């Protein structure tokens, strides 16, 4: 599933084509994805100007001129790609329609935005912009890890007394929004913290050190266009490249990359997910 860096990469790729442009026509080719689409979605989107394209956790939010916000979740295999060349901004001609092109936005600037999702775990919804934060998928989210509300004192307080492994705690979207398996594994490696360690038993200084490390890992991943392991593509169809910088994720049995450590990367299962770490230098 795309994590924060992948969703932010897609948002940045869509913004030049969508922000300030009008949805001249919305094409909805099925009644649902993971959940049913909102009533009259195509009609409600047609003629709306995209005032702002933003991200909250793993969701893309398009604030529309009519006072509604379109929520988009990529799910497991969803892709949003831009085609067309209205002002020399977009490098691809419109491709032929594909089997799993479920929603298409035809913008008044000539761009076309296609949502393709073979596994159909993605989602779209419409809500009033004024109360968007109260949407059931958004109201439960913790602070953004790249935002000002995610700081050392906050994380120390959030993890205090928790008996769950720190890996599971950091994946809790109510504690911090947008973190996923890949980037938690990578951040814990850089911090030298074992994913098995109980969150509430980690010294405050080590918890505090996690905050800038998490920010750094996410920022590097965004700069690299995210990580492409199976399905993820950027908005222009290109792969992400951060997978080439993984220290532990997907490297089971390979040598630890930390200078001076002769350990090997191990894989364990936590809450049904694979955790990758070096037991020798992550304590």
UniProtKB/Swiss-Prot annotation:
SUPFAM superfamilies: Glucocorticoid receptor-like (DNA-binding domain), N-terminal domain of MutM-like DNA repair proteins, S13-like H2TH domain. DNA binds at residues 100, 119, 162. Its cofactor is Zn(2+). The active site is at 2 (schiff-base intermediate with dna), 3 (proton donor), 58 (proton donor), 273 (proton donor). Its EC number is 3.2.2.23, 4.2.99.18. It catalyses: Hydrolysis of DNA containing ring-opened 7-methylguanine residues, releasing 2,6-diamino-4-hydroxy-5-(N-methyl)formamidopyrimidine; 2'-deoxyribonucleotide-(2'-deoxyribose 5'-phosphate)-2'-deoxyribonucleotide-DNA = a 3'-end 2'-deoxyribonucleotide-(2,3-dehydro-2,3-deoxyribose 5'-phosphate)-DNA + a 5'-end 5'-phospho-2'-deoxyribonucleoside-DNA + H(+). Involved in base excision repair of DNA damaged by oxidation or by mutagenic agents. Acts as a DNA glycosylase that recognizes and removes damaged bases. Has a preference for oxidized purines, such as 7,8-dihydro-8-oxoguanine (8-oxoG). Has AP (apurinic/apyrimidinic) lyase activity and introduces nicks in the DNA strand. Cleaves the DNA backbone by beta-delta elimination to generate a single-strand break at the site of the removed base with both 3'- and 5'-phosphates. The gene is mutM. Monomer. A zinc finger (FPG-type) spans 247-283. HAMAP family: Fapy_DNA_glycosyl. Keywords: DNA damage, DNA repair, DNA-binding, Glycosidase, Hydrolase, Lyase, Metal-binding, Multifunctional enzyme, Zinc, Zinc-finger. It comes from Ruegeria pomeroyi (strain ATCC 700808 / DSM 15171 / DSS-3). Binds 1 zinc ion per subunit. One of its GO terms (biological process) is base-excision repair. It comes from the Bacteria. This is Formamidopyrimidine-DNA glycosylase. One of its GO terms (molecular function) is zinc ion binding. Belongs to the FPG family.
């Amino acid at each position: 599933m795309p994590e924060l860096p992948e969703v932010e990469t897609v948002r940045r790729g869509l913004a030049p084509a969508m922000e300030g442009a009008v949805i001249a026509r919305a094409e909805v080719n099925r009644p649902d994805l993971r959940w049913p689409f909102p009533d009259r979605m195509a009609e409600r989107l047609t003629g709306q100007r995209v005032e702002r394209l933003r991200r909250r956790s793993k969701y893309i939010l398009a604030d529309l001129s009519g006072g509604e916000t379109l929520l988009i979740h990529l799910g497991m295999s969803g892709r949003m790609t831009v085609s067309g060349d209205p002002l020399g901004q977009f490098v691809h001609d419109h491709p032929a329609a594909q089997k799993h092109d479920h929603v298409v936005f035809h913008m008044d600037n000539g761009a076309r935005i296609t949502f393709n999702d073979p596994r159909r775990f993605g989602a779209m919804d419409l809500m009033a912009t004024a109360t968007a934060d109260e949407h059931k998928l958004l109201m439960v989210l913790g602070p953004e890890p790249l935002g000002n509300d995610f700081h050392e004192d906050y994380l120390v307080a959030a993890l205090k007394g928790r008996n769950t492994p720190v890996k599971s705690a950091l994946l809790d979207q109510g504690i911090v929004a947008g973190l996923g398996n890949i980037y938690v594994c990578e951040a814990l490696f850089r911090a030298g913290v074992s994913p098995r360690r109980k969150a509430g038993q980690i010294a405050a200084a080590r918890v505090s050190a996690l905050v800038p490390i998490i920010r750094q890992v996410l920022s590097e991943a965004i700069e690299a266009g995210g990580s492409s392991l199976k399905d993820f593509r950027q908005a222009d169809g290109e792969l992400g490249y951060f997978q080439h910088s993984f220290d532990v994720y997907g490297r089971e049995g390979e040598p630890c990359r930390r200078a001076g450590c002769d350990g090997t990367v191990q894989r364990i299962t936590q809450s049904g997910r694979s955790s990758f770490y070096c037991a020798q230098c992550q304590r």
